[in-house]
Amino acid sequence: MLGRCFPPDTKEKQQLRMTKLCDPAESELSPFLITLILAVLLAEYLIGIIANGFIMAIHAAEWVQNKAVSTSGRILVFLSVSRIALQSLMMLEITISSTSLSFYSEDAVYYAFKISFIFLNFCSLWFAAWLSFFYFVKIANFSYPLFLKLRWRITGLIPWLLWLSVFISFSHSMFCINICTVYCNNSFPIHSSNSTKKTYLSEINVVGLAFFFNLGIVTPLIMFILTATLLILSLKRHTLHMGSNATGSNDPSMEAHMGAIKAISYFLILYIFNAVALFIYLSNMFDINSLWNNLCQIIMAAYPAGHSILPIQDNPGLRRAWKRLQLRLHLYPKEWTL
């Protein structure tokens, strides 16, 4: 998505205006594989939008009805909104770039997609990191004075941290516009013949990319890894303590702790894969139509969907609401026919 094609050694390349786009790069994938990738992406987008829409609707309804919402619910609302917007944007971008390349290549349209994509991805990374941080502070069993003071103040800090993340993400997305430029060379010689072929070359602003990598991706990634790992260790230690005190492996409390450990581990793996795929995709390491680039897109689309399905399964309130929704959807056609 970040690659713009510029003929080398032209003013367009330097000014980043009135871009003269190259023809689309030749795809190295078969039509069947391209169709399969598009189908997988579409399914992931729809699952992510439905799952995040459900989470957002439940907590937003609670917010409106009770004039208040839990801190974790507030974070989930922010996270769900960012993911719905991101999944919708990615689905819209694929549709427009596939059906109307000339319109998609216009500067205003291209940069609108580019800035929105980076902004929503960074928001999603930060919100998920704050969710992990909040659970760590509330659940982990540590007795350090600083940790206890943080636990007492975390509820009041979270709203400010969420809006600060929005500001950081927006500022950083504006800064990252000109990190990478991709242009084509139409006269690359083929030594085995007298013909030439088109190649796509990239120029990367290394300083900008380093800043982009550290602030936009690595900072929330490190925070998520540290808090999730410490929370897993705390839960594991507490579970071992409960086991040594006797109650047996079928104790509901112990099963709940083990379920929490598995869920957090699952979140951690998804988050790391998504962050790595996002960095590779944004830095244009591979050709835009290569298998690796498409694999990064699949991972990025799978993360919001997979990361949202598990809370619905593990959270009793969300699980009950989901079952009620399924029951209503099942009964509605029967009532309509009557």
UniProtKB/Swiss-Prot annotation:
Residue intervals on the Extracellular side: 1-30, 96-116, 178-205, 284-291
Source organism superkingdom: Eukaryota
Record-linked SUPFAM superfamilies: Family A G protein-coupled receptor-like
Pfam families, alphabetized: TAS2R
Transmembrane segment boundaries: 31-51, 75-95, 117-137, 157-177, 206-226, 263-283, 292-312
UniProt GO molecular function: bitter taste receptor activity; G protein-coupled receptor activity
InterPro entries tied to this protein: TAS2R
Compartment(s) where it occurs, according to its Swiss-Prot or TrEMBL record: Membrane
Cytoplasmic side: 52-74, 138-156, 227-262, 313-338
Membrane topology, from the record: Multi-pass membrane protein
Chief localization: membrane
Family under the similarity heading: Belongs to the G-protein coupled receptor T2R family.
PANTHER family noted in UniProt: TASTE RECEPTOR TYPE 2, TASTE RECEPTOR TYPE 2 MEMBER 39
Extra information: Most taste cells may be activated by a limited number of bitter compounds; individual taste cells can discriminate among bitter stimuli.
Reported function: Receptor that may play a role in the perception of bitterness and is gustducin-linked. May play a role in sensing the chemical composition of the gastrointestinal content. The activity of this receptor may stimulate alpha gustducin, mediate PLC-beta-2 activation and lead to the gating of TRPM5.
Protein name from the UniProt record: Taste receptor type 2 member 39
Source species: Pan troglodytes (Chimpanzee)
Organism placement in taxonomy: Eukaryota, Metazoa, Chordata, Craniata, Vertebrata
Protein encoded by which gene: TAS2R39
